[in-house]
Curated annotation (Swiss-Prot):
Superkingdom field: Bacteria
Signal peptide: none
Species annotation: Acidovorax ebreus (strain TPSY)
GO terms of biological process kind: histidyl-tRNA aminoacylation; L-histidine biosynthetic process
This protein's record includes keyword Lyase: no
Classification of source organism: Bacteria, Pseudomonadati, Pseudomonadota, Betaproteobacteria, Burkholderiales
Stated role: Required for the first step of histidine biosynthesis. May allow the feedback regulation of ATP phosphoribosyltransferase activity by histidine.
InterPro entries in alphabetical order: aa-tRNA-synth_II/BPL/LPL, HisRS-like_core, HisRS/HisZ, HisZ
Protein name, entry field: ATP phosphoribosyltransferase regulatory subunit
Primary location group: cytoplasm
Length: 382
């Protein structure tokens, strides 16, 4: 095999795309900072138990594992950053009030999340710890929408769900893990006959409620129907109220609901959301409330947040035009060097043309040049 061949679903990022990714990264972090979020940088490599404790089998299968040559302990290359940020909040910051944290860095997956996806996403995320109220959920959604606006994503829409609805319907029932997985599968596939078979021994209210969920997807009228159908279940009513409050804050955005959507059921503890945009075959952003995320670190704080893959985002938003550069001759003269330095300090891109290479400036378009006129270096249009 040729030495330059990379592993499947791993790729080099070339200049034009790298520039776009970096501009998006800066814009996303600046947007998070404008909301009061502080940047943290967890390590790419960590003890395996710290990365996987409480995360479930899915993340375990996605994590590359190796042995530490210093200690002999098992290490993992992070497949998701949320658990690390929860550890930082619980032990390193240990704040009593609200903590707003954001991050942006690579993660590694043993398998791609979807067809043609990279196994090395650049994950950006923001999380708010310490507030159990709906305000934190709303802020997470609003910040994620603002992040997509800053990236110029088009035709953005939000899909909302809440795991508390199904949990409320199943509360107190003697449902084993295997049967629970089957029920989840039937709900995800919207398979009414399979769900009816699986729930035939359930109390009628729970059975009818679960079957009703298969039809409860669409616009806000879904919430009205659900409130009528799920009256016997206080947990479901609370979840519906929260979904209505979240949706009310999203002006100018198409909002849909799918009350049978159970993605992240073992991870989320309340409302969850997925955000789509023109050109994306899958959700660009996923987030919600995950109050149990810090429990394994001895500090079970309320938490809400979201994450996205900047490399996925770059594929669906247009790159801003590159600011035209200035072409300058190569030289070591004091006046020339001073003129170039002054222009660069002013924010200009100045490309010095090396001897024998004419106007080779790669992706930079030069619409001006630095020329010597009457003993002074001046910028002129080309």
């Amino acid at each position: 095999m040729s030495a330059w061949v990379l592993p499947d679903h791993i790729a080099d990022v070339l200049p034009s795309e790298a520039r776009h990714i970096e501009e998006l990264r800066r814009g996303l972090l600046d947007t998070a900072r404008s909301y009061g979020y502080e940047l943290v940088m967890p390590p790419l490599l960590e003890h395996l138990e710290s990365l996987l404790t409480g995360t479930g089998e899915a993340l375990d299968l996605q994590t590359f594992k190796l042995v530490d040559q210093l200690s002999g302990r098992s290490l993992g290359l992070r497949a998701d950053t949320t658990q690390q940020v929860a550890r930082i909040d619980a032990h390193l910051l240990n704040r009593q009030g609200v903590a707003r944290l954001c991050y942006c860095g690579p993660v590694l997956h043993t398998r791609p999340d979807r067809p043609h996806a990279t196994r090395e996403p650049l994950q950006f995320g923001a999380e708010i710890y310490g507030h159990p109220g709906i305000e934190a959920d709303i802020e997470a959604v609003l910040l994620s929408l603002e992040c997509l606006r800053s990236a110029h994503a088009q035709e953005v829409s939000v899909d909302l769900a809440d795991v508390r609805i199904v949990r409320s319907l199943l509360a107190g029932l003697p449902v084993g893990m295997h049967q629970l997985a089957q029920v989840h599968g039937a709900l995800a596939a919207k398979d009414a006959s399979e769900l009816a078979s699986l729930t035939r021994d359930f109390p009628s209210a729970s059975r009818e409620g679960l079957l009703a969920l298969l039809q409860l997807y669409g616009d806000a009228t879904v919430l009205n129907e659900a409130e009528n159908l799920l009256k016997p279940f206080p947990g479901a009513r609370e979840a519906l109220s929260d979904l209505r409050a979240i949706a009310a804050r999203m002006d100018g955005v198409r909002v849909t609901f799918d009350l049978a959507d159970l993605r992240g059921y073992a991870y989320y503890s309340g409302a969850r959301f997925a955000i789509y945009a023109q050109g994306a075959s899958d959700a660009l952003v996923r987030g919600g409330r995950y109050d149990e995320v810090g429990a394994v670190f001895g500090r079970n704080r309320p938490a809400a947040g979201f994450s996205l893959d900047v490399k996925q985002l770059v594929g669906v938003v247009s790159a801003p035009s590159l600011r035209a550069a200035i072409r300058a001759p190569w030289g070591d003269g004091g006046a020339l060097s001073a003129a170039i330095a002054t222009l660069r300090r002013q924010g200009e891109t100045v490309v010095c043309v090396l001897p024998g290479h004419g106007s080779e400036v790669d992706e930079f378009h030069c619409d001006r040049e630095l020329v010597l006129v009457d003993g002074n270096w001046v910028v002129k249009a080309i």
